[in-house]
């Protein structure tokens, strides 16, 4: 674990918070450091894995100096609570659908500092790709290079995102959308990363997989709160 990196991230976040107070309304004002769970329409189980985010937040409190809340917040794309979180998580096994207004609001939030992590729980791939292409038709998803900070910021993942659950023999992949040099959307695919955050007895994961999933989550969150400009 790179302890100095955590201190750098905290300093960066504090400088961002100071800057937010000095800037205009277009800069998102993150009220607290927590994770927003996206309540989306379309029929998919957006609520899947109820123990996942509390466990990740607990790991962040234990392993970093970041002032992280104990619980996630359920948010919608058109509600004011979206602007209170720096990191938005979405998962599920079914269909995802955004309204035209939700598409506009999500793009605006991401352009102004937000970070979306979509975790395909083996079922939402087709609909997520369709909907995120509506949000950024001019910025297609690309595979995130292994040199990117999300794989090295706190813990090293030289081979990229870890494979947590095996379903069809395909490798785990991390895709993303960049605005300039900033990664604003991260899509964990063919891995079940969020399932790895859940209580180990839920999926009977071995300790090393649970730990790998939490470590990757720590990297993602610390990147999200340190790359808001």
List where the protein language model places each region.
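Bacterial N-terminal signal peptides
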Residues: 4-15
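Loop/turn elements at helix/coil->beta-strand transitions in domains of secreted/extracellular proteins
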Residues: 31-33, 83-87, 112-115, 139, ...
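An acidic, glycine-rich "communication" segment
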Residues: 43, 125-201, 207-218
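Short alpha-beta junction capping motif
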Residues: 35, 87-126
């Amino acid at each position: 674990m790179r302890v100095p990196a955590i201190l750098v991230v905290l300093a960066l976040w504090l400088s961002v918070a100071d800057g937010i107070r000095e800037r205009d309304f277009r800069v998102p004002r993150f009220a607290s450091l927590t994770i927003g769970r996206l309540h989306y329409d379309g029929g998919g189980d957006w609520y899947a894995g109820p123990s996942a985010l509390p466990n990740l937040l607990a790991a962040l409190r234990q392993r970093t100096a970041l002032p992280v809340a104990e619980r996630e917040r359920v948010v919608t794309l058109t509600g004011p609570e979206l602007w209170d979180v720096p990191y938005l998580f979405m998962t599920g096994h079914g269909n995802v659908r955004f309204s035209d207004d939700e598409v506009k609001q999500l793009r605006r939030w991401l352009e102004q500092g937000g970070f979306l992590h979509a975790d395909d729980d083996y079922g939402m791939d087709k609909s997520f790709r369709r909907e995120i292409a509506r949000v950024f038709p001019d910025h297609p998803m690309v595979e995130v290079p292994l040199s990117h900070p999300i794989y090295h910021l706190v813990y090293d993942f030289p081979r990229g995102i870890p494979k947590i659950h095996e379903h069809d023999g395909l490798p785990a992949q991390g895709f993303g959308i960049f605005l300039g040099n900033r990664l604003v959307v991260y899509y964990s695919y063919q891995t079940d990363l969020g399932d790895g955050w859940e209580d180990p007895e839920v999926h009977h994961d071995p300790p090393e997989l649970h730990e790998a999933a939490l470590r990757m989550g720590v990297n993602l969150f610390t990147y999200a709160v340190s790359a808001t400009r």
